[in-house]
C-alpha cells in the first residue's frame, strides 16, 4: 500500500499493523508525536508524514487539541488478521489539504507562533472584561439563568453606532447577534444555495471556508486575489459572464490568508457588478477593524443599495475569542432564529465595555501592536529569507503571505521544518487544487522574540537549500 523503502512508509506500515492486529483498539488514542519520535527514533516530520498516510487511508482521525485516534468504523466487530482487513483505499479519503490541516491542529497546544492565525492574548483587555462581567452577574442575576435579548438591546445599539462609523446605514433592528464561528456561513449557504451550485471565492481562501463549501456540496470558482490589492475584478466580471454563480463569498479588507485591501472604487465596482447579475455576496469583514491606518476601511456593505450583500463580523476577535460574539446584517434574519446565540451575560459584558469609553483606546493599542509586529516580521523575513522569497506589505490584519518560485514545494519545506519544531501554513491549505504550494503564510499576531527570529533564520536557510536543489535538478537530468 505504501512505499516501505521510505522511513515514513515503513513507520505507517508498522502503525497499521498495531491498529489491525496489535495493541491499538477502535477509539484508542495513539501516542503523541513526541512519544512516537522517541520510540521509533524518527524525526517529527517522518512521524507526521506517516500519520498523514494513515489519516488519508481512513484508519485514524484527529481531534483538535487532543491527538490522533483509531477510527471506530475502520474495524469489523471481531479482530481480524491483517490480510483480512478491508483495504483502507475503500474508505473515504480526506482531501490532502484537509488531512494536512487536521495533522497541523495536533500542534495547537504547542508554542508555534507562526502557524496558527492568533493574536497575542496579552493584547486583549481581559482584566477590564472580567471586572465588567463580575459586576453584570452581581447586579443582574437573571443573566445567569438566561433571558431573551430583543433587537433593541444595548449591544444591538452599540453595533448600529459602529455601523455608521463604517459608512453603513443600518439600525439596531437590522442586526442579528451570532456566535463567532462559521455558523453564519453555514446558515447563509443553506439559505442562498443548493448542493451542486457554484460559489465564487477569492483565492487564496481560508481553509475553513473551503471546508464549509465542501460540506454543503458546493462547487468552488476561485477568483485570483492580489496579496496587496485584493480581488481581480476583471476576472470576476469575465467569470460572471461565463458561469452560473449562485453566490459569492468575499472579504474586502485584510482577508485571511493574504491581508490585502481593495480600493473603495474596487469595492463599489464589485457590488455593482454582482447587482447587475443578481448574485448575492456573503461578506466576511472580521478583520476590517484591524487596520494600521487612521481610518477604518469601508466594507462592501457600505456600497450596497439592493440588499444583496449579507454582512457579518466578529467582535470578540477584537477583545478576546472567549466571548465568541459575532453579528450579521442581512435580510435573511429569519434564517438565524434557529441557531444558538452567545450567552446574555457575555453580550451585556461586551456592550458595557463598548459603552465605557475603553473600547476605542483598546482598539488603537491593538492596531499599533499588530502594525509593529507586522513590521518586525517583514524585517526578519527580508534579513533571513533568500531574495527569491517575495513578501507583501499589508495595511492590516495579522498574517504575511510569501511567494516562492513556481515549482517550490512548501509542503515538503514544512516537513523539513517540523524536524526542528518550526511550523507554518503551506499554500496548498488555501486552495482546492494545490496550485499555491509554492506559497506560505506566517502568522504575525505574536511578537518577534529571539526564538521566532531564530526560527525565521532557520526557515530561510531551509528555503535557500531547497531552492539550490531545484536549480540543480535540471542539470542533473541533463547529465543523465
Task: Enumerate the language-model features and the residues they cover.
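Conserved glycine-rich beta-strand-loop-beta hairpin in the small C-terminal domain of fold type I
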Residues: 368-378, 389-403
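Conserved core of the PLP fold type I
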Residues: 140-277, 289-290, 295-298, 302-303, ...
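Conserved core segment of the aminotransferase class I/II
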Residues: 129, 305-371
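N-terminal basic, amphipathic alpha-helical segments
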Residues: 1-134, 332, 339-342, 351, ...
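Short beta-strand "wing" residues that participate in macromolecule-binding interfaces
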Residues: 61-63, 170, 424
Amino acid at each position: 500500500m505504501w512505499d516501505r523503502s521510505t522511513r515514513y512508509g515503513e513507520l505507517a506500515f508498522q502503525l497499521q499493523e498495531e491498529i489491525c492486529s496489535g495493541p491499538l483498539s477502535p477509539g484508542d488514542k495513539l501516542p503523541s508525536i513526541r512519544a512516537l519520535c522517541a520510540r521509533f527514533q524518527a524525526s517529527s516530520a517522518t512521524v507526521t508524514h506517516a500519520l498523514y498516510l494513515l489519516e488519508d487511508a481512513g484508519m485514524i482521525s484527529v481531534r483538535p487539541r487532543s491527538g490522533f485516534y483509531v477510527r471506530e468504523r475502520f474495524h469489523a466487530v471481531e479482530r481480524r488478521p491483517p490480510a483480512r482487513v478491508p483495504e483502507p483505499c475503500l474508505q473515504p479519503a480526506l482531501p490532502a489539504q484537509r488531512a494536512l490541516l487536521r495533522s497541523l491542529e495536533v500542534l495547537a497546544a504547542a508554542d508555534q507562533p507562526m502557524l496558527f492565525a492568533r493574536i497575542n492574548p496579552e493584547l486583549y483587555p481581559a482584566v477590564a472584561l472580567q471586572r465588567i462581567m463580575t459586576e453584570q452577574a452581581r447586579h443582574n442575576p437573571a443573566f445567569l439563568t438566561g433571558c431573551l435579548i430583543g433587537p433593541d438591546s444595548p449591544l444591538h445599539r452599540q453595533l448600529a453606532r459602529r455601523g455608521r462609523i463604517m459608512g453603513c446605514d443600518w439600525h439596531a433592528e437590522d442586526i442579528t447577534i451570532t456566535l463567532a464561528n462559521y455558523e453564519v456561513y453555514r446558515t447563509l449557504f443553506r439559505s442562498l444555495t443548493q448542493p451542486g451550485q457554484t460559489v465564487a471565492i477569492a483565492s487564496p481562501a481560508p481553509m475553513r471556508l473551503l471546508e464549509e463549501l465542501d460540506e454543503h456540496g458546493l462547487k468552488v470558482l476561485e477568483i485570483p486575489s492580489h496579496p496587496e490589492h485584493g480581488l481581480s475584478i476583471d476576472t470576476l466580471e469575465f467569470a460572471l459572464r461565463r458561469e452560473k454563480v449562485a453566490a459569492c463569498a468575499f472579504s474586502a479588507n485584510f482577508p485571511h490568508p493574504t491581508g490585502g485591501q481593495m480600493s473603495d472604487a474596487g469595492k463599489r465596482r464589485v457590488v455593482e457588478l454582482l447587482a447587475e447579475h443578481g448574485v448575492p455576496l456573503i461578506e466576511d469583514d472580521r478583520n476590517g477593524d484591524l487596520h494600521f491606518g487612521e481610518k477604518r476601511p469601508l466594507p462592501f456593505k457600505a456600497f450596497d443599495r439592493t440588499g444583496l450583500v449579507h454582512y457579518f463580523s466578529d467582535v470578540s476577535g477584537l477583545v478576546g475569542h472567549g466571548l465568541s460574539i459575532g453579528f450579521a446584517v442581512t435580510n435573511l434574519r429569519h434564517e438565524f432564529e434557529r441557531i444558538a446565540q452567545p450567552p446574555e451575560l457575555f453580550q451585556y459584558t461586551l456592550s458595557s465595555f463598548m459603552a465605557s469609553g475603553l473600547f476605542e483606546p483598546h482598539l488603537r493599542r491593538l492596531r499599533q501592536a499588530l502594525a509593529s509586529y507586522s513590521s518586525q516580521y517583514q524585517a526578519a523575513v527580508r534579513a533571513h529569507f533568500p531574495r527569491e522569497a517575495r513578501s507583501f506589505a499589508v495595511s492590516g490584519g495579522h498574517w504575511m503571505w510569501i511567494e516562492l518560485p513556481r515549482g517550490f514545494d512548501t509542503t515538503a519545506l514544512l516537513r523539513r521544518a517540523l524536524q526542528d519544531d518550526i511550523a507554518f501554513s503551506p499554500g496548498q491549505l488555501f486552495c482546492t487544487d494545490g496550485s499555491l504550494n509554492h506559497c506560505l503564510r506566517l502568522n504575525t499576531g505574536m511578537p518577534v522574540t529571539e526564538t521566532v527570529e531564530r526560527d525565521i533564520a532557520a526557515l530561510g536557510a531551509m528555503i535557500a537549500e531547497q531552492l539550490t536543489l531545484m536549480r540543480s535538478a535540471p542539470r542533473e537530468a541533463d547529465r543523465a
